[in-house]
């Protein structure tokens, strides 16, 4: 169970880092938002899901 928690936290950190870099780039590009809207929403949905997964796994471990 601890390995699953550690992998979920690692995935959350990686996803957060990717979103911190990619979202400003999407907004800065002239046509980026209309072309990459689905990618940003998918990344945000993944991030929210990982936050809930980490919270659930944390409550099971503690």
Curated annotation (Swiss-Prot):
InterPro entries: PSII_PsbZ, PSII_PsbZ_sf. GO terms for cellular component: chloroplast thylakoid membrane; photosystem II reaction center; plastid. The keyword Protein biosynthesis does not apply. SUPFAM superfamilies: PsbZ-like. It is found in: Plastid, Chloroplast thylakoid membrane. PSII is composed of 1 copy each of membrane proteins PsbA, PsbB, PsbC, PsbD, PsbE, PsbF, PsbH, PsbI, PsbJ, PsbK, PsbL, PsbM, PsbT, PsbY, PsbZ, Psb30/Ycf12, at least 3 peripheral proteins of the oxygen-evolving complex and a large number of cofactors. It forms dimeric complexes. This is Photosystem II reaction center protein Z. It comes from Oryza sativa subsp. indica. The gene is psbZ.
């Amino acid at each position: 169970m601890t390995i699953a928690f550690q992998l979920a936290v690692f995935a959350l950190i990686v996803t957060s880092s990717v979103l911190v870099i990619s979202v400003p780039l999407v907004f800065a590009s002239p046509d980026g938002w209309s072309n990459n809207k689905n990618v940003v929403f998918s990344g945000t949905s993944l991030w929210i899901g990982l936050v809930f997964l980490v919270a659930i796994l944390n409550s099971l471990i503690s």
